[in-house]
């Protein structure tokens, strides 16, 4: 049986190699030229750009450096060895792929099962093309008519013959529990096969086409290579994505024992529902559960079965990735994450009863384990500047609470979530690493903690940890040794990794270092958990989705209305001098002035490095959306007069604007200025982008006379006179000393969006007696002394502007209900005094009305909110894990 399977696999994989030899002839191009193995920006790639963590960082690829998602094998011979060569030429060993005659994988005629006499099932051809097989009182199956998989009968019931041997194997028997089915499948597989399915590809598709998958497609290449997981970058396409997912599952069903593909997704704000900090501002775990349940339904409807989140890092004030978290408070993060994950992972009947795992369940990889919110200077840990998370307050335990007391001990029937490892190396206040100089995927201290606890969920690495990001500590190891070490330390799935040849070599190395029995124990544990999760998700029996239902659910008027309702709960009012109230505006359609704002385009990111950018003008809020509620006047953008860009086109300068006349502004009912919180990331002037880090390391990474720049939470330039003289963290230099990353005395320039403040200053000056309303889009705290004195009303929109809700609040139709999830510091000196690992330890800004902008502060029509949420979450931050004796573990292992 195994020999036959391996031969079939050998032939199928070799199809790709033989097609490559055809070049530009009439035969299709080789599918292995459509993708590559070195891909990988963040597994949370949706949540990590300098300005908008959910924006596409490759919208302007020429500005962001090389695209890590590009195919390095598009020009054979230039990109290194092909990672999709056949690793099974010598099962259990590494080595080169061998050639064999090509075969046609999808040559079989369309298959539709015909129930025999006494059959207890019915067969329906769906409009989507897959076959639905409904067993009486049993499982409903989904089957592709072109995958080669047929039906076998037993006791009158239908079962999918996933390994195509004409028999009913236990793993194909839906009457058995997931553990028993998993055990049978694992017993049928070779060691290197089990290792290969642990690949979680960064590149499951190139165009997410709605056309059937061909042998030229990336989807075919990756899945026929053996990967059985991968992230989608296109989940918002709704029905089109569902069609692609169905086609991908048909390919997966055709080979590799019919194992389905786990399609994962980053946070995506699907249907406009609030997530991360915008969900946190509601401080409502019940709403988090509702959103988790609805999000899971929508994800499953597009074919997604795993969520790369939620991000439960306890964020420091300057953390670059703060916008993807639930804020800075451990109790709030614990409550929201537990409710959200519990609801996402469970399936519910019509009465709301928790059924545990089922057809509506989405598996969660809670991230980033653990402590990633405490990076020094807030630096992004994808890049070597953010290599370390620091714990000067000896408070790592507070960053573990959400895991051990929450998502590892869910109140529902699914028990526990999975986890994603962090990139950073955790160090104490003296700069001494927890578990040695190892990033999260390799770290024995963090992985050992999970083992000591008895964690039985899936562990996936963050993206790129075997190649460029989070490879910290393993730089001198070849890739197969990195992968083998990761498995030895306890990780299961390899996030963003595609290279089957490296996997074959890593498995051989695992056997060499540990012996066959121990190597199989390591791989079997990882593969078994992965298979069992997909069994629990009902993926083996029914991996297909009804795209008509997708269209009804995703992007529908009903789902959009629900998304808007969640947004209404999230907006925070922190100042109101009486300008707005429940009584509404005096006019039916008030007249408002909305200015344009200038942005220099400067950015520093782990993807694009130091990018001077180019200037741009844009309306400070969505004028089309606001025009439904207001008579809007605005500015006029003139032709650009700045220096030409690389294409010879003039660029915009701060002077290329004609502001609305002051007399027109004075005739308005309101001035409404949309702003984005100021944020300047901490970086050094020899900044190394993530995917050239290894090359830089190999060539001698360390530079003399490096200047480090401070993070800043204000619009104006900031000189860090009170910063640490010596940084806590730093790489060990060739002479054995530690690099000093201090930025004391260095000045951060004006924020790239300093134009927001200039627009407010002009509007305030021109307004006269016209009330000025600021709508601030935020992802963290900020210094308000530049803004607050100029505004009569301030509304905070976490993650992004919500123009409909802002308009409703101004018109008195919606009462603000949100609360601040970050302290707003009095000044930057408070930020410098703050200990990165200690929540809520700053003196906060007090405004002209006497209100202090502290955590859990917010106003409604009656004034300062003081409800049960405020009473619950205003208590002193918790710092002790209840479900795990961390102090004992630390004493024994640090």
Please name every model-derived segment.
Residues 1-10:
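Bacterial N-terminal signal peptides that target proteins for export
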Residues 17-21:
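C-terminal motif of bacterial Sec signal peptides marking the signal peptidase cleavage site
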Residues 23-25:
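Bacterial signal peptide processing site
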Residues 29, 33, 39-43, 55-894:
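Glycoside hydrolase catalytic-domain context in secreted enzymes
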Residues 45-50:
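G/A/S/T/P/Q/N-biased, glycine-rich low-complexity segments that form flexible N-terminal tails, linkers
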